[in-house]
Design a protein with these regions (language model features):
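A conserved beta-strand element that flanks and buttresses the S-adenosyl-L-methionine
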Residues: 114
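Basic phosphate/pyrophosphate-binding loop/patch that engages nucleotide-derived ligands
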Residues: 137
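Short catalytic micro-motifs in class I SAM-dependent methyltransferases
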Residues: 117-121
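Class I (Rossmann-like) S-adenosyl-L-methionine-dependent methyltransferase catalytic domain
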Residues: 1-105, 126, 133, 141-272
Length: 272
């Protein structure tokens, strides 16, 4: 299904930040365990490395760095959700409200960045490419970045991921997905929780831990996702000339890529 780009952009700008502000409390309560692959990356960095957590959510990686006594410089942290940032500050960390496509940091200064479960919320190929370029611009030559996104394929080597194992599902072959009308016009497929993805662009409902979450309309608790096909993240990275792919792995239903900023030659602007 091909969706209108204006509709997808509307979902990013007008809907997604409101959703995370609405569900911030129950979302934060459910996000406490860091991904092992992200922690391996952070632990591999030299002492004193300075980096950014882009789309920091409730700050769980800021907490993990502190709890593991990693000798990194204090991380820059940002997110689009004001209420999630309240949770970050409540944990004793500084963070700013910022969009991935308009980060408030100077370019070429950081040793690393992590961007976990953020890029898959950007609703067009161009916005996803621009997001990677935005992060790449922050790195100094030789700097590293980790980008993690949700995978469309929730089976790996014949086994279901924990996401699917947490629910019961039947074969989705031949299933016609329900479509949800969204403000601004148009419709987008509604993905049933804990079932295999049958489209790459979907709305996913939030199963609120706190049943008292108030919502003004049906869409207010639905998050837009673009789930990545095999090789899709690598293909995007290949379009950013200043980056080279170091590693790409599949971890429990996610694609995770580590990239390196190519050292610029003398007089070269290497941020594209």
């Amino acid at each position: 299904m091909i969706l209108d780009e204006d509709l997808l952009t509307f979902l990013n700008i007008s809907i997604l930040p409101q959703v995370y502000d609405t569900i911030a409390g129950s979302f934060s309560d459910s996000r406490y365990a860091p991904w092992p692959g992200v922690m391996r990356f952070l632990k591999s960095l030299p002492p004193g490395s300075w980096g950014a957590d882009i789309g920091c959510g409730n700050g769980k990686y800021l907490v993990a760095v502190a709890q593991n006594n990693l000798l990194l410089s204090p991380l820059l942290a940002s997110d689009t959700s004001i209420r999630l940032l309240d949770h970050v500050r409540g944990r004793g960390f500084d963070a700013v409200a910022a969009n991935l496509l308009a980060l408030p940091y100077r370019s070429g200064l950081l040793d690393f960045f992590i961007c976990v479960a953020v890029l898959h919320h950007l609703a067009t190929p161009q916005r996803r490419l621009d997001g990677i370029k935005s992060m790449a611009s922050l790195l100094k030559g030789g700097g590293l970045g980790l980008i993690q996104v949700w995978a469309k394929d929730q089976h790996w080597k014949g086994k279901s991921t924990m996401y699917l194992k947490s629910g019961k599902f039947e074969s989705t072959e031949g299933v016609v997905m329900e479509e949800v009308a969204v403000p601004g016009g148009g419709k987008i497929p509604l993905q049933k929780l804990r079932t295999p993805f049958v489209a790459t662009d979907v709305l996913l409902p939030w199963n609120a831990v706190n049943k008292k979450v108030e919502t003004p309309n049906k869409v207010a608790l639905m998050r837009y996702y673009h789930v990545f096909e095999t090789g899709e993240l690598e293909n995007l990275i290949a379009q950013v000339s200043c980056l080279e792919l170091v590693e790409s792995v599949y971890e429990q239903g996610n694609w995770s890529a580590i990239v390196r900023k190519i050292e610029p030659t003398l007089g070269e602007n290497n941020n594209e």
